[in-house]
């Protein structure tokens, strides 16, 4: 069995001017004009008299976050806004550990026990809509000139690597680059008609038993969260977006603004999951069954292909950690963009270096030879490192293969390496 993990870097080649990156989405959620737009749109749906935080207040909070962490990305900003919104919605100290911590801190500082902001409850949804609509705008106006060719190449890569056997595709990306590239390959989302209210929702039996599945553990533009603690799946992202907005006026299925209790605070991760504590999402459908299938897929695979992943999500990392120890023949193929020459000697000293992260996640050994004649350190497998720097592909640890030239180049030459 083969498992594919498509993460943020896998979508970059499909868009241009601008590209779909963390930086691009961060700039969008920081933009005062975006907050003015979505809050105005929200009021049109709910009525002008609705109580909601002003765009100016939301931007002030974001700027305050950035004053402490100037390089905060959109996930870090989401984390803080979600927690503020959780307390604003329900400040009772017995209703969540965050509320209790907040109340104790207020007592220690002699602060009044009031909410941190009026009308913040819907801000997490609007934050996620800024992200969703930014991606929809990219899909409308900024696709790469060879977008269709890239879809065909991605299709060919998956077909070549999966070799007609059982396979699972896990995508953390909200866009349509993965689903649009799977035509003819037999991958199933396993969303099935349920009733006239919820339309298409996950069929758990089909999903857990399908030989080929594709799933989105961080949510997707095609998802619409509903009031039965699940999502409805739409085949069209624009229609899904319209339904989410219509859900504000209760004219569509379910309840767009459904939130669920979490262990620490309320969980606002609904149709897409962001922030830095995503684990609460896996207590709700379809994410709960996604996580179960993901654990099974990784454990049952002989090869895992990882495209454009930063190795920053603990809920993925913990599932991959034992993979190489399950069978001596298991292997990992990682595709990323690494412009510098690889030495495989000192990279471990930088904990943020992707090579260092790979070593930590898979529990591999970092082997270095000391050349006493030259008084310097050399990689254990010198020929493989030389090949990697020359050709772009090589074995960096036992059974861990790395392609360093980026996903665009990989799609043009994957048959040379796999």
Each predicted region: which residue ranges?
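Short, well-ordered alpha-helical microsegments
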Residues: 154-155, 178-179, 313-317
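Extended, H/D-rich, highly charged conserved domains that either
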Residues: 44-129, 156-269
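Short amphipathic alpha-helical surface micro-motifs
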Residues: 152, 192-204, 254, 286-288, ...
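Residue-level signal for secondary-structure boundary elements
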Residues: 70-77, 89-92, 109-116, 135-147, ...
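SIR2/sirtuin-family catalytic core signature
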Residues: 1-28, 32-57, 68, 207-209, ...
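Alpha/beta-hydrolase fold catalytic core
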Residues: 125-151, 261-301, 305, 309-313
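Conserved glycosyltransferase catalytic-site signature
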Residues: 12, 151-155, 174
